[in-house]
Amino acid sequence: MKICLIDETGAGDGALSVLASRWGLEHDEDNLMALVLTPEHLELRKRDEPKLGGIFVDFVGGTMAHRRKFGGGRGEAVAKAVGIKGDYLPDVVDATAGLGRDAFVLASVGCRVRMLERNPVVAALLDDGLARGYADAEIGGWLQERLQLIHASSLTALTDITPRPQVVYLDPMFPHKQKSALVKKEMRVFQSLVGPDLDADGLLEPARLLATKRVVVKRPDYAPPLANVATPNAVVTKGHRFDIYAGTPV
């Protein structure tokens, strides 16, 4: 995959070249999307909109730390949707990991989560965030136990993941209604990189065959159900709903 690669560390140790070969990235000087290695982290920038800033994965500080400490925990909609109750903490495959936010919330309340991400740039960002998270004194221990990354396409990986999870979680990209600043800067940068999930409808059936209990699909409230398969079961929040489908028991 072609992207502009920029090293701002000043270290001159070739770390960016190692990273590029690991994730199959090729430097393209004219690409509007840039993957930048800074002294702190790896980040994604949209070069024609510098005001948007860089996007990076941070499980240790910022909004994720706040959500972990002061968020709803088990009361969060995603936790309710996957079926967390009492001692039941399902094993989850997050088949559309993105920046790992929902996966992190589930891991922080005790679920084991395997994240699937097919885009190599997003996978590199996730891997960088995980490495910093794993090394953190406060969260590193449980994060290593509960949150892992698999760089693979969900369309193929969903058929051969073992052991089977109890829950498969899907949050495919859906075109935004607004073109304004209401669309978070992050989503704008993200959609420039990966585009809409045109094959997302193809994920529902393999997800239902893989999950032993349920499949949870996060949708904007205005979006039709995935693959146009309606379900009466959903956890509804302001702006989103989590559609719940039966899996395939062992």
Curated annotation (Swiss-Prot):
UniProt superkingdom: Bacteria
Signal peptide: none
Coiled-coil residue spans: none
Name of the coding gene: rsmJ
SUPFAM superfamilies: S-adenosyl-L-methionine-dependent methyltransferases (SSF53335)
EC number annotated for this UniProt entry: 2.1.1.242
Pfam families from the UniProt entry: SAM_MT
InterPro entries cross-referenced by the UniProt entry: 16SrRNA_methylTrfase_J (IPR007536), SAM-dependent_MTases_sf (IPR029063)
Record: residues binding S-adenosyl-L-methionine: 101-102, 117-118, 153-154, 171
Cited CDD domains: AdoMet_MTases
Family: Belongs to the methyltransferase superfamily. RsmJ family.
Catalytic activity field: guanosine(1516) in 16S rRNA + S-adenosyl-L-methionine = N(2)-methylguanosine(1516) in 16S rRNA + S-adenosyl-L-homocysteine + H(+)
Role summary: Specifically methylates the guanosine in position 1516 of 16S rRNA.
An example molecular function term from Gene Ontology annotations: rRNA (guanine-N2-)-methyltransferase activity
Subcellular location: Cytoplasm
Cellular-component GO terms for this entry: cytoplasm
Keyword entries, A-Z: Cytoplasm, Methyltransferase, rRNA processing, S-adenosyl-L-methionine, Transferase
Full protein name: Ribosomal RNA small subunit methyltransferase J
Organism field: Escherichia fergusonii (strain ATCC 35469 / DSM 13698 / CCUG 18766 / IAM 14443 / JCM 21226 / LMG 7866 / NBRC 102419 / NCTC 12128 / CDC 0568-73)
Broad EC category: transferase
